[in-house]
Amino acid sequence: MTWLKLKKQCSKITLNPFCYVTYSLQTASIVMVFLLLLQAALLVATKSYRSLILAVATVAASLVAEAFFRLTHKEVSEDTWSICIAQGLLTGLLLPNLCSVYATFFLTLFSFMFCKFVFGNFSSSWANCSVLAVAVIYFLDSSCFPQAAVSLADLQSKNPSLHLIQSGTLPILKTDSSLTAFLNENAFSHFGSMIPEGYASFFWDNGSAIPAFRFNLLTIVSSLVIFSFGFADTVIPAVFLFVYAALVRFVSPAFVSGVAFQGDILLALLTGGTLFCAVYLLQWHGSVPTTFWGKVFYGVLAGVAAFFIVGCGTSSVGFVFLVLAMNTISPLIQKTEEELLCSSAVKRLRFRLKGNRD
Protein backbone atom coordinates (compact mmCIF):
# COMPACT_ATOMS: atom_id res chain seq x y z
CA MET A 1 0.00 0.00 0.00
CA THR A 2 1.39 3.43 -0.93
CA TRP A 3 1.96 6.15 1.68
CA LEU A 4 -0.83 8.27 0.16
CA LYS A 5 -3.38 5.45 0.56
CA LEU A 6 -2.11 4.71 4.07
CA LYS A 7 -2.42 8.36 5.07
CA LYS A 8 -5.96 8.56 3.68
CA GLN A 9 -7.00 5.33 5.40
CA CYS A 10 -5.70 6.47 8.78
CA SER A 11 -6.91 10.09 8.55
CA LYS A 12 -9.99 9.56 10.75
CA ILE A 13 -9.57 9.98 14.50
CA THR A 14 -11.36 7.24 16.46
CA LEU A 15 -11.26 5.68 19.91
CA ASN A 16 -9.96 2.41 18.46
CA PRO A 17 -6.32 1.68 19.37
CA PHE A 18 -5.51 0.27 15.92
CA CYS A 19 -6.34 1.25 12.34
CA TYR A 20 -6.54 -1.61 9.86
CA VAL A 21 -5.43 -0.65 6.36
CA THR A 22 -6.56 -3.91 4.79
CA TYR A 23 -8.86 -6.83 5.50
CA SER A 24 -7.63 -9.54 7.83
CA LEU A 25 -6.45 -12.84 6.43
CA GLN A 26 -9.38 -14.64 8.00
CA THR A 27 -11.91 -12.25 6.44
CA ALA A 28 -10.32 -12.55 2.99
CA SER A 29 -10.20 -16.35 3.21
CA ILE A 30 -13.85 -16.56 4.33
CA VAL A 31 -14.88 -14.45 1.34
CA MET A 32 -12.87 -16.74 -0.94
CA VAL A 33 -14.55 -19.82 0.54
CA PHE A 34 -17.97 -18.24 0.03
CA LEU A 35 -17.24 -17.45 -3.62
CA LEU A 36 -15.90 -20.95 -4.23
CA LEU A 37 -19.01 -22.40 -2.61
CA LEU A 38 -21.04 -20.53 -5.24
CA GLN A 39 -19.14 -22.56 -7.84
CA ALA A 40 -20.09 -25.69 -5.90
CA ALA A 41 -23.72 -24.53 -5.78
CA LEU A 42 -23.76 -24.38 -9.58
CA LEU A 43 -22.47 -27.95 -9.64
CA VAL A 44 -25.56 -28.91 -7.65
CA ALA A 45 -27.79 -26.86 -9.97
CA THR A 46 -26.32 -28.60 -13.03
CA LYS A 47 -26.49 -32.02 -11.33
CA SER A 48 -22.71 -32.47 -11.50
CA TYR A 49 -22.69 -34.56 -8.34
CA ARG A 50 -19.50 -36.43 -9.17
CA SER A 51 -17.50 -33.20 -9.22
CA LEU A 52 -19.17 -32.12 -5.99
CA ILE A 53 -18.16 -35.36 -4.25
CA LEU A 54 -14.56 -34.86 -5.40
CA ALA A 55 -14.58 -31.35 -3.92
CA VAL A 56 -15.86 -32.72 -0.60
CA ALA A 57 -13.10 -35.35 -0.63
CA THR A 58 -10.35 -32.79 -1.24
CA VAL A 59 -11.70 -30.47 1.47
CA ALA A 60 -11.71 -33.40 3.91
CA ALA A 61 -8.13 -34.28 2.93
CA SER A 62 -7.03 -30.67 3.43
CA LEU A 63 -8.61 -30.52 6.90
CA VAL A 64 -7.05 -33.85 7.95
CA ALA A 65 -3.61 -32.66 6.79
CA GLU A 66 -4.02 -29.42 8.74
CA ALA A 67 -5.17 -31.25 11.88
CA PHE A 68 -2.17 -33.60 11.74
CA PHE A 69 0.17 -30.65 11.20
CA ARG A 70 -1.27 -28.91 14.26
CA LEU A 71 -0.65 -32.01 16.38
CA THR A 72 3.07 -31.81 15.63
CA HIS A 73 3.45 -28.01 15.65
CA LYS A 74 2.32 -25.92 18.60
CA GLU A 75 2.40 -22.38 17.22
CA VAL A 76 -0.08 -22.40 14.34
CA SER A 77 -2.44 -19.53 13.54
CA GLU A 78 -6.16 -20.20 13.94
CA ASP A 79 -6.80 -18.34 10.67
CA THR A 80 -5.49 -21.28 8.65
CA TRP A 81 -8.67 -23.36 9.03
CA SER A 82 -10.57 -21.23 6.53
CA ILE A 83 -7.50 -21.23 4.29
CA CYS A 84 -7.50 -25.05 4.41
CA ILE A 85 -11.11 -25.17 3.29
CA ALA A 86 -10.29 -22.78 0.43
CA GLN A 87 -7.31 -24.91 -0.62
CA GLY A 88 -9.42 -28.05 -0.54
CA LEU A 89 -12.14 -26.44 -2.65
CA LEU A 90 -9.58 -25.16 -5.16
CA THR A 91 -8.10 -28.64 -5.50
CA GLY A 92 -11.47 -30.29 -6.03
CA LEU A 93 -12.62 -27.71 -8.56
CA LEU A 94 -9.42 -28.20 -10.58
CA LEU A 95 -9.98 -31.96 -10.98
CA PRO A 96 -12.02 -33.59 -13.77
CA ASN A 97 -15.08 -35.59 -12.82
CA LEU A 98 -13.51 -38.88 -13.98
CA CYS A 99 -11.02 -39.03 -11.10
CA SER A 100 -11.40 -41.72 -8.45
CA VAL A 101 -12.81 -40.34 -5.21
CA TYR A 102 -10.69 -42.57 -2.94
CA ALA A 103 -7.48 -41.96 -4.90
CA THR A 104 -8.21 -38.24 -4.94
CA PHE A 105 -8.61 -38.14 -1.15
CA PHE A 106 -5.39 -40.00 -0.34
CA LEU A 107 -3.28 -38.29 -3.02
CA THR A 108 -4.52 -34.87 -1.90
CA LEU A 109 -3.79 -35.78 1.73
CA PHE A 110 -0.27 -36.93 0.82
CA SER A 111 0.39 -33.83 -1.30
CA PHE A 112 -0.83 -31.41 1.37
CA MET A 113 1.15 -33.11 4.15
CA PHE A 114 4.26 -33.15 1.97
CA CYS A 115 3.78 -29.47 1.17
CA LYS A 116 3.24 -28.50 4.82
CA PHE A 117 6.05 -30.55 6.37
CA VAL A 118 8.66 -29.94 3.66
CA PHE A 119 7.94 -26.41 2.45
CA GLY A 120 6.13 -24.99 5.48
CA ASN A 121 2.52 -24.25 6.36
CA PHE A 122 0.45 -21.63 4.53
CA SER A 123 2.42 -18.46 3.65
CA SER A 124 5.74 -20.02 4.72
CA SER A 125 5.45 -22.37 1.75
CA TRP A 126 6.70 -21.18 -1.61
CA ALA A 127 4.57 -23.80 -3.41
CA ASN A 128 0.80 -23.78 -3.90
CA CYS A 129 -0.48 -26.98 -2.26
CA SER A 130 -3.62 -27.10 -4.41
CA VAL A 131 -1.85 -27.13 -7.77
CA LEU A 132 0.81 -29.48 -6.40
CA ALA A 133 -1.91 -31.99 -5.51
CA VAL A 134 -3.49 -31.68 -8.96
CA ALA A 135 -0.08 -32.18 -10.60
CA VAL A 136 0.52 -35.36 -8.57
CA ILE A 137 -2.89 -36.74 -9.55
CA TYR A 138 -2.23 -35.87 -13.20
CA PHE A 139 1.11 -37.70 -13.28
CA LEU A 140 -0.41 -40.80 -11.68
CA ASP A 141 -3.55 -40.87 -13.84
CA SER A 142 -3.43 -38.50 -16.79
CA SER A 143 -6.14 -40.44 -18.62
CA CYS A 144 -8.91 -38.84 -16.56
CA PHE A 145 -7.91 -35.36 -17.74
CA PRO A 146 -9.59 -34.25 -20.99
CA GLN A 147 -7.56 -33.63 -24.12
CA ALA A 148 -7.41 -30.23 -25.80
CA ALA A 149 -10.67 -29.60 -27.69
CA VAL A 150 -9.13 -27.35 -30.32
CA SER A 151 -7.13 -28.64 -33.30
CA LEU A 152 -4.51 -26.97 -35.48
CA ALA A 153 -7.11 -26.48 -38.22
CA ASP A 154 -9.37 -24.69 -35.73
CA LEU A 155 -6.58 -22.34 -34.67
CA GLN A 156 -5.83 -21.52 -38.30
CA SER A 157 -9.37 -20.21 -38.76
CA LYS A 158 -10.29 -16.63 -37.95
CA ASN A 159 -12.65 -17.51 -35.08
CA PRO A 160 -11.85 -20.88 -33.44
CA SER A 161 -14.28 -20.41 -30.54
CA LEU A 162 -17.22 -19.86 -32.91
CA HIS A 163 -16.18 -22.97 -34.85
CA LEU A 164 -16.21 -25.03 -31.64
CA ILE A 165 -19.69 -23.71 -30.80
CA GLN A 166 -21.08 -24.45 -34.25
CA SER A 167 -19.54 -27.93 -34.32
CA GLY A 168 -21.19 -28.84 -31.02
CA THR A 169 -17.93 -29.22 -29.10
CA LEU A 170 -19.09 -26.51 -26.70
CA PRO A 171 -22.64 -27.12 -25.41
CA ILE A 172 -25.37 -24.51 -25.94
CA LEU A 173 -28.05 -23.70 -23.37
CA LYS A 174 -31.73 -24.02 -24.27
CA THR A 175 -32.23 -20.33 -23.48
CA ASP A 176 -29.20 -19.23 -25.50
CA SER A 177 -31.21 -17.87 -28.46
CA SER A 178 -33.47 -15.66 -26.35
CA LEU A 179 -30.59 -14.53 -24.14
CA THR A 180 -28.42 -13.66 -27.15
CA ALA A 181 -31.29 -11.72 -28.73
CA PHE A 182 -31.82 -9.80 -25.49
CA LEU A 183 -28.12 -8.89 -25.21
CA ASN A 184 -27.88 -7.84 -28.86
CA GLU A 185 -31.00 -5.69 -28.64
CA ASN A 186 -30.29 -4.01 -25.31
CA ALA A 187 -26.51 -3.90 -25.11
CA PHE A 188 -24.38 -4.67 -28.15
CA SER A 189 -26.64 -2.86 -30.64
CA HIS A 190 -25.73 0.45 -28.98
CA PHE A 191 -22.10 -0.18 -29.95
CA GLY A 192 -22.94 -1.18 -33.51
CA SER A 193 -22.05 -4.84 -33.03
CA MET A 194 -23.80 -8.18 -32.57
CA ILE A 195 -22.74 -11.47 -30.99
CA PRO A 196 -23.65 -14.80 -32.61
CA GLU A 197 -25.63 -17.48 -30.81
CA GLY A 198 -23.59 -19.66 -28.50
CA TYR A 199 -21.45 -17.04 -26.81
CA ALA A 200 -23.93 -16.54 -23.96
CA SER A 201 -23.59 -20.25 -23.17
CA PHE A 202 -19.83 -19.94 -23.59
CA PHE A 203 -19.73 -17.37 -20.79
CA TRP A 204 -22.24 -19.08 -18.51
CA ASP A 205 -21.22 -22.77 -18.73
CA ASN A 206 -18.78 -24.09 -21.32
CA GLY A 207 -19.40 -27.70 -20.24
CA SER A 208 -15.82 -28.51 -19.27
CA ALA A 209 -15.17 -31.70 -17.29
CA ILE A 210 -13.17 -29.54 -14.86
CA PRO A 211 -15.55 -27.42 -12.70
CA ALA A 212 -13.12 -24.51 -12.28
CA PHE A 213 -13.16 -23.95 -16.05
CA ARG A 214 -16.94 -24.01 -16.52
CA PHE A 215 -18.63 -20.97 -14.99
CA ASN A 216 -16.71 -18.01 -16.42
CA LEU A 217 -19.43 -15.45 -15.72
CA LEU A 218 -19.44 -16.38 -12.03
CA THR A 219 -15.63 -16.18 -11.97
CA ILE A 220 -15.78 -12.69 -13.49
CA VAL A 221 -18.37 -11.54 -10.93
CA SER A 222 -16.28 -13.09 -8.13
CA SER A 223 -13.20 -11.23 -9.36
CA LEU A 224 -15.13 -7.95 -9.19
CA VAL A 225 -15.96 -8.67 -5.55
CA ILE A 226 -12.40 -9.69 -4.66
CA PHE A 227 -10.63 -6.82 -6.37
CA SER A 228 -13.19 -4.05 -5.82
CA PHE A 229 -13.27 -4.55 -2.05
CA GLY A 230 -9.51 -5.00 -1.80
CA PHE A 231 -9.40 -8.66 -0.76
CA ALA A 232 -6.57 -9.18 -3.27
CA ASP A 233 -4.22 -7.01 -5.29
CA THR A 234 -5.01 -6.30 -8.95
CA VAL A 235 -1.50 -5.75 -10.34
CA ILE A 236 -0.49 -9.34 -11.06
CA PRO A 237 -3.82 -10.52 -12.56
CA ALA A 238 -4.19 -7.38 -14.70
CA VAL A 239 -0.64 -7.50 -16.08
CA PHE A 240 -0.82 -11.26 -16.60
CA LEU A 241 -4.11 -11.17 -18.53
CA PHE A 242 -2.97 -8.22 -20.65
CA VAL A 243 0.34 -9.84 -21.65
CA TYR A 244 -1.20 -13.27 -22.26
CA ALA A 245 -4.12 -11.88 -24.28
CA ALA A 246 -1.79 -9.69 -26.35
CA LEU A 247 0.47 -12.64 -27.19
CA VAL A 248 -2.52 -14.80 -28.13
CA ARG A 249 -3.96 -12.06 -30.32
CA PHE A 250 -0.85 -10.90 -32.16
CA VAL A 251 1.78 -13.66 -31.87
CA SER A 252 -0.09 -16.99 -31.81
CA PRO A 253 -1.22 -16.84 -35.49
CA ALA A 254 2.43 -16.84 -36.55
CA PHE A 255 2.98 -20.20 -34.80
CA VAL A 256 -0.04 -21.95 -36.36
CA SER A 257 -0.02 -20.26 -39.80
CA GLY A 258 -3.31 -18.58 -38.96
CA VAL A 259 -4.80 -15.21 -39.91
CA ALA A 260 -2.28 -12.52 -38.95
CA PHE A 261 -3.06 -10.62 -35.73
CA GLN A 262 -6.40 -12.44 -35.35
CA GLY A 263 -5.75 -14.83 -32.46
CA ASP A 264 -8.89 -15.78 -30.53
CA ILE A 265 -8.70 -14.02 -27.16
CA LEU A 266 -12.10 -15.31 -26.01
CA LEU A 267 -11.02 -18.91 -26.56
CA ALA A 268 -7.85 -18.29 -24.56
CA LEU A 269 -9.58 -16.53 -21.67
CA LEU A 270 -12.77 -18.61 -21.38
CA THR A 271 -11.25 -22.10 -21.68
CA GLY A 272 -8.45 -23.81 -19.80
CA GLY A 273 -9.20 -21.97 -16.55
CA THR A 274 -7.41 -18.73 -17.47
CA LEU A 275 -9.73 -16.46 -15.49
CA PHE A 276 -9.95 -18.86 -12.56
CA CYS A 277 -6.16 -19.09 -12.39
CA ALA A 278 -5.74 -15.31 -12.53
CA VAL A 279 -8.26 -14.74 -9.73
CA TYR A 280 -7.54 -17.59 -7.30
CA LEU A 281 -4.19 -19.26 -8.00
CA LEU A 282 -1.59 -17.00 -9.55
CA GLN A 283 -1.00 -14.81 -6.50
CA TRP A 284 -1.44 -17.19 -3.60
CA HIS A 285 -0.32 -15.93 -0.19
CA GLY A 286 3.43 -15.97 0.31
CA SER A 287 4.24 -17.06 -3.24
CA VAL A 288 4.45 -13.67 -5.01
CA PRO A 289 6.69 -10.58 -4.89
CA THR A 290 5.77 -7.70 -2.59
CA THR A 291 6.87 -4.55 -4.43
CA PHE A 292 4.95 -2.95 -7.29
CA TRP A 293 7.62 -3.48 -9.94
CA GLY A 294 8.25 -6.98 -8.65
CA LYS A 295 4.57 -7.76 -9.17
CA VAL A 296 4.65 -6.21 -12.65
CA PHE A 297 7.66 -8.32 -13.62
CA TYR A 298 5.99 -11.41 -12.13
CA GLY A 299 2.79 -10.72 -14.13
CA VAL A 300 4.70 -10.20 -17.39
CA LEU A 301 6.72 -13.35 -16.87
CA ALA A 302 3.56 -15.32 -16.03
CA GLY A 303 1.84 -14.05 -19.19
CA VAL A 304 4.77 -15.08 -21.39
CA ALA A 305 5.06 -18.45 -19.65
CA ALA A 306 1.31 -19.06 -20.04
CA PHE A 307 1.56 -18.43 -23.76
CA PHE A 308 4.18 -21.17 -24.17
CA ILE A 309 2.86 -23.62 -21.54
CA VAL A 310 -0.91 -23.27 -21.96
CA GLY A 311 -1.06 -22.13 -25.57
CA CYS A 312 -4.25 -20.67 -26.99
CA GLY A 313 -6.75 -22.34 -24.66
CA THR A 314 -8.62 -25.59 -23.85
CA SER A 315 -5.66 -27.05 -21.92
CA SER A 316 -6.74 -29.11 -18.89
CA VAL A 317 -3.55 -28.87 -16.79
CA GLY A 318 -1.52 -26.12 -18.42
CA PHE A 319 -2.22 -23.56 -15.72
CA VAL A 320 -1.34 -26.06 -12.99
CA PHE A 321 2.20 -26.29 -14.32
CA LEU A 322 2.25 -22.55 -14.98
CA VAL A 323 1.58 -21.82 -11.30
CA LEU A 324 4.19 -24.36 -10.20
CA ALA A 325 6.72 -22.83 -12.59
CA MET A 326 6.02 -19.35 -11.23
CA ASN A 327 6.31 -20.70 -7.67
CA THR A 328 9.89 -21.76 -8.41
CA ILE A 329 10.78 -18.40 -9.97
CA SER A 330 9.11 -16.17 -7.38
CA PRO A 331 11.71 -16.73 -4.60
CA LEU A 332 14.40 -15.40 -6.95
CA ILE A 333 12.34 -12.28 -7.62
CA GLN A 334 11.70 -11.82 -3.90
CA LYS A 335 15.41 -12.23 -3.15
CA THR A 336 16.22 -9.55 -5.73
CA GLU A 337 13.58 -7.29 -4.17
CA GLU A 338 15.17 -7.66 -0.73
CA GLU A 339 18.64 -6.86 -2.06
CA LEU A 340 17.43 -3.78 -3.93
CA LEU A 341 15.44 -2.51 -0.95
CA CYS A 342 18.38 -3.10 1.36
CA SER A 343 20.75 -1.31 -1.02
CA SER A 344 18.33 1.62 -1.33
CA ALA A 345 17.94 1.86 2.45
CA VAL A 346 21.72 1.86 2.95
CA LYS A 347 22.14 4.66 0.39
CA ARG A 348 19.47 6.81 2.06
CA LEU A 349 21.00 6.19 5.48
CA ARG A 350 24.46 7.19 4.28
CA PHE A 351 23.03 10.33 2.68
CA ARG A 352 21.30 11.34 5.92
CA LEU A 353 24.39 10.65 8.03
CA LYS A 354 26.48 12.71 5.64
CA GLY A 355 23.94 15.55 5.83
CA ASN A 356 23.98 15.52 9.64
CA ARG A 357 27.78 15.75 9.69
CA ASP A 358 27.72 18.71 7.36
What are these regions (language model features)?
Residues S124-I220:
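Long hydrophobic alpha-helical segments that form multi-pass transmembrane helix bundles
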Residues W126-V131, I265-T274, K295, C312-M326:
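Loop-to-transmembrane alpha-helix initiation sites
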Residues S48-A60, L98-F106, F203-L217, F261-T274:
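Structural signature of hydrophobic alpha-helical transmembrane segments
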Residues M1-L71, C342-D358:
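N-terminal signal-anchor module of multipass membrane proteins
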Residues L35-L42, S62-E66, C84-L93, T108-C115, ...:
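Hydrophobic, membrane-inserted alpha-helices
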Residues S77-Q87, A103-L107, S124-V134, T234-F242, ...:
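Cytoplasmic-side transmembrane-helix entry/capping segments in multi-pass membrane proteins
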Residues V248-F292:
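A beta-strand-loop signature enriched in Asp, Gly, Thr, and Trp
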Residues L25-S29, E197-V221, V225-T234, Q262-G263, ...:
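Membrane-water interface at loop-to-transmembrane-helix junctions
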